[in-house]
Amino acid sequence: HSHSEVSQISGEWYSVLLASDHREKIEYNGSMRVFVEYIH
């Protein structure tokens, strides 16, 4: 593999991991917000 191919694959995985982590945090915060409103 050339260096450019490795860099491209690493970049794609990095983007996927960032998107996944960001999505999970949004879902967690959203669930907690609904839970708190439900209690009050």
From Swiss-Prot:
GO terms for biological process: sensory perception of smell. Keywords: Olfaction, Sensory transduction, Transport. Transmembrane segments: none annotated. It comes from the Eukaryota. InterPro entries: Calycin, Lipocalin_CS. Signal peptide: none annotated. Homodimer. Belongs to the calycin superfamily. Lipocalin family. Binds the chemical odorant, 2-isobutyl-3-methoxypyrazine. This is Odorant-binding protein 3. It comes from Oryctolagus cuniculus.
